[in-house]
């Protein structure tokens, strides 16, 4: 009887596959004519206003292109959602990426940031 219970429990718990959690990713790029510093400052404000304050970082490009931009990224305090805004004055573009496990929350945060200006 003990072996039967063992094999029954083994069959119940090993038959299914592990749950696969796949993140959602939303990305956009925009033309940008301002300076790299303006973009970084405004991007930092936009992310903070939307709650991306955990592991918050502003990183400027190194070397001669330091004033040409960099990136700002952060995570929501209590949810697994990450946002990143990159500013590149030399290319005249800025990029936005938001990723997370919860599609509704990820898209909501992406939409709000998409509508902001930095």
Residues covered by each model-derived region:
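A cross-family detector of function-defining hotspots
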Residues: 50-77
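C-terminal partner/receptor-binding element of secreted or periplasmic proteins
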Residues: 102-118
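Extracytoplasmic/periplasmic, Sec-exported soluble proteins
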Residues: 31-39, 75, 98-106
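Amphipathic N-proximal alpha-helical interface segments
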Residues: 75-95
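Terminal, regulation- and interaction-focused segments at domain boundaries
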Residues: 19-55
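Short, surface-exposed coil-to-beta transition loops
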Residues: 25-27, 77-83, 108
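Bacterial N-terminal signal peptides
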Residues: 5-14
